[in-house]
Amino acid sequence: QDNIPIFRYHVAFDFEDNTDFIEWYANVMYRSYYTSDIPCSINDEYLTLSTCSTEIYDSRFVVVARKLRDGEDASQYTYYSNPDARKPAAFYKAYGMKVPDDKGPDYDYYKDILSKMEGNEN
């Protein structure tokens, strides 16, 4: 059993308020294998693709993308691997690794990141 709540990414859409958006964004970034400096806001449009994963039993591989804004060029951003991507407890156990002892994403940390993004009204 994991010590953090299950991220219900499949029910996240039409955020009620900025708090809901920050919670969703923090969970996405906390689990991301790859990350970038692409600015994100509650007003952007997002696409979520989810498929079966063979890493561990009954798991999913999820891709989240943000629609380009008018006049935006995706090549202006930097993309990199995230060595700290949080995986489900079952992943660590399946590969004989210690399950991280954390409480989930640090919402204040991700809220601060969002507030520093250029053109972000969060």
Model-derived segments and spans:
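Extracytoplasmic/periplasmic soluble domains downstream of a signal peptide or transmembrane helix
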Residues: Q1-N122
